[in-house]
């Protein structure tokens, strides 16, 4: 009997999912991406060598693991092919391991142009997108006008749809945003080149997943971004354009929720956020700078500096509920080494002094102040610890208090960037 495990982020992304997926794929037959696009950036460190993945599932570095991209992922063919070539230059046989649903929506040049034009027009009110066309591609999908990978293999039909789409989007680009139009013939020629390279990678991912399930294989689902960036449950409108929570698995891969056995929520031992939007525990002092420097807090996709703050138990409790989390993985514990005291946000206080629960949209965060519980820090190093007993008593107390506050067990603790720098208390595939 196989197990089907989900790994997803519980904060605003950048929680360290890539390392944990790579660690757990030792037990998996397949790793599946089910939402997002190449706005994700998953960093893996194996024997000191760093690899950053954007579209391809993190299981690609494991021999014998099949990597699947489900229908919920928006695919930029140029970005995908660049990533494939980069990995192949390292000797990784990507094309043997990777298969893609033909139902994936395409991200094309006009999506990127629209994304960047909108952010530019918003000025100081920009959302902080990666500018890679993710949102506009999902818009086309929901409006039922988008092109999908499967359309690439029918030239005449594709050309007709592309012409209609460009008429529509170029009108907005030129007349509203005062940006140059996207050329039809250039776009069509590029897409036909992509078609030849992508055709061998096509697979009915949904059917393949259910065949594996019936055969008792272990399957892992890899989330991108974090729960608080979910289009429905995140800090709207400062969110991404897909469902980053566990519900996105069913829609983004065709694998029903009753088949899932364990949902692992990844959370940092502190909190970070990239781009605009509410962040109640954000630090603007020396501690914030310390966390950013020690944690190397720069986006794997954009290179942008991440905002840093104290651990927020309020948002984690919400993420645990909306994802039905089975257990947590606490990452970057070692970044807290050397801090004299550590704060945990246990609630929010409004201007009247009343303590309230997590708001449901960005505007509702205005005027809220974090309520902190202070804990002693530790001077000893936790870097590379492989057992709970190796951790300082204060670090163990911090872990226990987090569990108590959020109501979920911490089953895995990451104590460094390498896959071996990990404490596994309960294995998701166990």
From Swiss-Prot:
The entry marks the following residues as binding IMP, namely: 14-17, 39-42, 130, 144, 225, 240, 304
Which principal EC class is assigned to this enzyme? ligase
**Residues where GTP binds:** 13-19, 41-43, 306, 332-334, 414-416
Sites binding Mg(2+) sit at 14, 41
InterPro entries named in the record: Adenylosuccin_syn_GTP-bd, Adenylosuccin_syn_Lys_AS, Adenylosuccinate_synth_dom1, Adenylosuccinate_synth_dom2, Adenylosuccinate_synth_dom3, Adenylosuccinate_synthetase, P-loop_NTPase
Its recorded reaction(s) are: IMP + L-aspartate + GTP = N(6)-(1,2-dicarboxyethyl)-AMP + GDP + phosphate + 2 H(+)
The residues responsible for catalysis, as annotated, are 14, 42
Q: What is this protein called?
A: Adenylosuccinate synthetase
Organism name: Pseudomonas syringae pv. syringae (strain B728a)
Gene name on record? purA
